[in-house]
A protein has these predicted regions:
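Alpha-helical assembly-interface signal, strongest on the long, hydrophobic N-terminal helix that forms
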Residues: 1-68
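Short, conserved structural patches
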Residues: 2-3, 62-128
């Protein structure tokens, strides 16, 4: 009697699907949220590295570093990094660019996850 079902099992598949589907959907959305956060981190790191690369060229300039990082974000971030801010700190020997922002959220009512990435580079100095 392999193909016969017991009368008490009728509709069991529908109940199982109704219970497991929301859990699976939540898991998939959480994985996508994590992927968006990692992508936003990658964009922030790229902007920080671009700013540090531009700012360390002789003559070193924190304004040029900030402009380069902002330009990178304008070209690549669109809506993937919101509330973004670029902070540049320079010393005679190094320059540090920090990019902060928020990744988008897939869950209504919840804010995205915070993103902070920094890049430091030595200031180029001509030597005789």
């Amino acid at each position: 009697m392999v193909g016969r079902r017991l009368s008490g099992e009728r509709g069991a598949a529908s109940v199982e699907l109704a219970v497991t589907f929301p859990v699976v959907l939540l898991l998939v959305m959480t994985l996508i949220q994590v992927a968006l956060w990692f992508h936003a981190r990658s964009i922030a790191l790229g902007a920080a590295q671009e700013g540090a690369r531009e700012g360390r060229v002789q003559p070193a300039s924190t304004a040029r570093a900030e402009t380069a990082a902002e330009g990178f974000l304008d070209q690549t971030a669109s809506d993937l990094l919101t509330g973004r801010d670029v902070a540049v700190a320079g010393s005679p020997t190094s320059i540090e660019v920090t990019v902060t922002g928020t990744s988008p959220s897939l869950f209504p009512g919840l804010s995205g996850w915070s993103v902070t990435q920094s890049a430091v580079g030595p200031v180029e100095r001509p030597t005789p």
